[in-house]
Structure formats: structure tokens, C-alpha cells
Amino acid sequence: MWCLVLFSLLASFSAEPTMHGEILSPNYPQAYPNDVVKSWDIEVPEGFGIHLYFTHVDIEPSESCAYDSVQIISGGIEEGRLCGQKTSKSPNSPIIEEFQFPYNKLQVVFTSDFSNEERFTGFAAYYTAIDINECTDFTDVPCSHFCNNFIGGYFCSCPPEYFLHDDMRNCGVNCSGDVFTALIGEISSPNYPNPYPENSRCEYQIQLQEGFQVVVTMQREDFDVEPADSEGNCPDSLTFASKNQQFGPYCGNGFPGPLTIRTQSNTLGIVFQTDLMGQKKGWKLRYHGDPISCAKKITANSTWEPDKAKYVFKDVVKITCVDGFEVVEGHVSSTSYYSTCQSDGQWSNSGLKCQPVYCGIPDPIANGKVEEPENSVFGTVVHYTCEEPYYYMEHEEGGEYRCAANGRWVNDQLGIELPRCIPACGVPTEPFQVHQRIFGGQPAKIENFPWQVFFNHPRASGALINEYWVLTAAHVLEKISDPLMYVGTMSVRTTLLENAQRLYSKRVFIHPSWKKEDDPNTRTNFDNDIALVQLKDPVKMGPKVSPICLPGTSSEYNVSPGDMGLISGWGSTEKKVFVINLRGAKVPVTSLETCKQVKEENPTVRPEDYVFTDNMICAGEKGVDSCHGDSGGAFAFQVPNVTVPKFYVAGLVSWGKRCGTYGVYTKVKNYVDWILKTMQENSGPRKD
């Protein structure tokens, strides 16, 4: 292996005699290397002279061509030396310099020194044996660019950056493969504004980042392409093709298409096709990248922020639903969402819509119902009703609910709180037809006294005052905290009680001023004989079960002698035995003095020891009275000043000296504050 470092390269070229040839400087048409000496020995057949001519000379200029040069030597004599940048003396001829020699041998020597400050491409020369000139002696030019004559023929050649097609006559240009990625630029046909090459296909690509569309702008005067033929076909044409559409082909003098082409694509292909003829200057265009725009799509029932006339790539908007509408994604809902203008001109989240808020199925309520709506969306109105006549709406305007913007059912008065159906008090299903009193009274239906509570142990009565509370006498519960109670039954026969509604006590509250005694049989003080039983579960009201009203605190609820009230129960009769079926009677109020005058039946108690207070009511008449087993039952009076008769509990059966005469009743009006306070302080969460 030879390893040489050469600062000067000497090369020579010689061959058998030929009729023609080509001589090119090293690396032509690229820049020639430094420090080179290369020679060519030209020889044509005997009898021919040599015609040597240069078509390209671009050699470092110097005085007398002392640095770089190409020498023409004939017979040892220098016939010429060339350097510098030379051009053709005639625009119609590619020949820059030419030499003719009568002899058939010639030497060409190219020399370059050790350095060049600029880029020089060297030279291109051709030689022929002198004979006829096919390139000039005929009318038709055989070559599209350069014609080179030789004895017996010719050959065609092309200028730099061109190539010779397979037909060996026409030159084309290598103008494909350029890719433009800058957001702004300019593209023109080859040689513009000089004539473009014939028989060529130039392909260019504009590729911008996603989110930008290619916008092409043309000036009519910057377009000069061979016009269409009589049938409208373009022999030479310029065509644009984006992803989804094509623009063109275009040809003619002056651009015939729109001067601004918006492609709606970030890529654009440009094809310039020419045929074998033509001498037009071509075209020049400018392009830039314009952010892709997204159309403002009006989403129903929403607002856009910011609100602009035009939205472009990467713009973000907040879409907020108007009141009563929401966006639902899976199981998550919200009142707004964000959308971004994407690179394809479409909005992200375009599938989201503002739809009416869904409130769901209205919650049920105890002792009432709600109409089933056709739908449960914003603006829908539903109505709650109670199971009349046994329940009524606690708030008169509390039945109408509207599906609100927050997705909740809302009432103008109660807000989101559900309406409450409370028992209607004091209205018996069947009014009691009075004939006589309990003691020797008359049979009654439970529908006459639906508030009647039967205490089986101890045997007594009570009054249902709402769904969770029973009012009775304190002495009934003095020795027991878990009474056995029933409602809704006329008969207290053991077998029939199984079908009655049993009440379970949660807690017993005896009035704090009630005085306990060890022996109830000797009690003489029944002051504050009142108690409350709180129930574990609410009582279901109906035709046989409903509460009695509490008295008001006004003077209208004061009872006076002569006023008639109703009593009921399962106490003993004139025969001294407990009854099985409910009995009722109507009794008048008398003065307390009347009760004081009753003869005592119990010999162990002195009559003067009995205590009479303003907390007591005396009522009854001979043969008409409550008795043992009726204790705690209601002494009912009609509520004053009402259109539909209803009853309130004015008194509770408390005590008496002798059955069948006059009895003493606890005056409930004096205890209303205690009753309400006790119920309020001990009411837990409602089971609505």
C-alpha cells in the first residue's frame, strides 16, 4: 500500500485518436481543488483539424493568469491561457472561447495553486475533428440547449444544474425534493425570471407544524406560463394539492386563479410540469402559515368566554351553561367546561352539550305522595299531597316543588326540605250521636273517638295527640313505665286486640309537680294529674286512628258550668264491671263545689282531705259519669269558631269520690306549655 501526502498532483490524460471529446476541470461543476496540475492530450484522426472551444470558464483571476489557469499547448507552443470568469460573447452561442488548429494533436493543462479565497467551478471544454457542423448548418436545432458538432455527427449537452434526458436531445432540471418548513417563504420556478426549463417536472413540498394552514399569495404579473391550447389543456402547468383538495392546474400570462389560496391544511404539494417547448419566464409565489381557525359553534343554553369574532389554533374558551343546565361526563356533572381550538380546525370536547339539570325522582314522604313527573329536569314542577282527610300539609304552600338549577327539588317556602304531612286532629270519621253518659252510657264506635288509646296494663285510657305522643293521667303511669297500649279498636277483647295497632312506649314523662304516694287507694291529692308517653314509632292514622287537638291558650278554650263535653272508654258501668266494647257519653261541666259535695265512697278517706285546685274541672250528673278504667281518657269539646266540627282535649279523666255522680278532670289548658316543651325537647329526628 502506498501512503502519500501530496501537495501537488500531476495527472495526464491521453487516449486513442477520437473525433471529439469533452474536457472538464476536476470536480466540475463543483469547485475545483487546490494545488492541482492536470493535463489532457487530445488527438483526432489524421486528416482532421481540431476545433477546441470552452463553454464554461470560472477560474481564479490573476494577472497574466499566474495563479490558476488552463493552457492550450500545440507543438510545445502555448496557443492560449485562460483564467477569470468569462461569459459567452454571443447570447446565441454557449462558446466562451474557441480555438481552431490545423493539426491533429493538442495538449490542455489545468493548474491551480495552493489556495483560493473564493469558490471557482473551473471549466468545461469540448473538441472536435473539424468537418461539417450539424449544429449550425441545419434549420432545426437538434438540441434543446447546447449542440456539439463532430465529424459525422453531433451530441447535445446541458448547462450546470441540468441533466440530459434519455432522448439525448433535451435537457431537464433537477428541481424536485425541496421541502419548505419555515412559516413564511418564497418559491419560484427554475431560472425565474429567466425562461424555465422545458420537459421538466418540479415538485415542492411545504410542510408546516400542525395547527397552521398554508396560505399562498400570488401577483398576476409574477405568473407567465405557456397558455392553454384551443381545448383548454395546459401544456405547462402549476398545480397545488393539499390534503383534501386541489387547486389548478393553472397556466397563461397572468395568474388565473385566486390571488390568495387558503388551503386549510398544514401541508401543500406544488407541481410544475413543462413540455418540450416554450420560452416563458415562469412564476413566483409567496406563502405563509396562518393559524387554523375554528368556527364558533353556538352551543345551546351556554355562553362563551372570551367572546371573539375569530378563534384560531390553541385558543381556549370556557363554555358555561346557563342556569338550569349542566354538562354530564359519565357520572360527573359540572356547569362549565373548556374547549381548545385544535390543529384540525375542530374544537376539543365538541361532543359535550349543556343539557337540562336532572333532579332525579322526587323523594317520597311519609303519609303522603308525590305525582310522578314525565321527566325530572330543570323547570319541572311536581306536587306533594297528604293522605287526606287523616293528614294535612304542615305548611299550606309546601306542596309545590320545582326542579331548580342546583339539581334539587325546591319549594318557595321550605327550600329543599321535604314537606311534612301531619295528622289532622279532632275530626272523627263518624260523629258521635249522644243518648246518655258512659256510666250507664251508650255503645260507641272507635270512628266516633279515633283518638282513644286503650291501656291494657294498667287498665285505663289515653288520648293520642300526635303520631308520637299519648296524653294520659299521671296516676295511670305512677307504678309502670312501659304500658301496654292499643289504638284503632272498638273491642278490647283479647282475641280482637291482635288486630289492633299496638303502641310501644319509648319514654314516660309524668308532670314534675305530681306528688307520688305509696298507697294510691288513700290518695287525696290529684293535682297535676297529667303525663305523656313518647312512642318508639309513629302511629299510622286512618279512619279508626287520629289524634285529638290540644287546647289553645286563649279564653275561648275555658270551659264553664253548663258546657257539654264528650267522654269515652272501657271503664266499669253501673253494674261495676269493665266493658268489652267502647262506650261514650255527653256530660256537662259543673262547678268544683259540686264535686266537693259528693259523698265519699271510700271509708278510709276523710272527705275534707281531698285537694281541689284550679287545675281541675268538675263534670257529670247523676247516673252519667266516668269510672274505674276510664282514667286518662279525653274530656273532648268542640274547637270554638271553626266551620267543620273538630274536638280538643279540655280535660283528662282523673278521679272521683263515687262513680255515677260527678267526676274530676285534669284541666289540660293549664298544661299546654309543659306538653309542648316536653315534646319539643324530646323529639328526635323525624322518620319522614
UniProtKB/Swiss-Prot annotation:
Ca(2+) 2 binds at D131, I132, E134, N149, F150, G153. One of its GO terms (biological process) is proteolysis. SUPFAM superfamilies: Complement control module/SCR domain, EGF/Laminin, Spermadhesin, CUB domain, Trypsin-like serine proteases. Ca(2+) 3 binds at E226, D236, D275, G278, Q279. The modification (3R)-3-hydroxyasparagine is found at N149. The record marks R437, I438 as: Cleavage. It holds the Pfam family FXa_inhibition. Ca(2+) 1 binds at E60, D68, D113. Residues 292-356, 357-423 form the Sushi domain. Cleaved and activated by C1R. Immunoglobulin-binding promotes autoactivation of C1R, which results in the cleavage of the Arg-Ile bond in the catalytic domain. Inhibited by C1 inhibitor (SERPING1). Residues 1-15 form the signal peptide. Disulfide bonds join C65-C83, C135-C147, C143-C156, C158-C171, C175-C202, C234-C251, C294-C341, C321-C354, C359-C403, C386-C421, C425-C549, C595-C618, C627-C659. GO terms for molecular function: calcium ion binding; serine-type endopeptidase activity. The active site is at H475, D529, S631. It is found in: Secreted; Cell surface. Belongs to the peptidase S1 family. PANTHER family: COMPLEMENT C1S SUBCOMPONENT, COMPLEMENT COMPONENT 1, S SUBCOMPONENT-RELATED. This is Complement C1s-1 subcomponent.
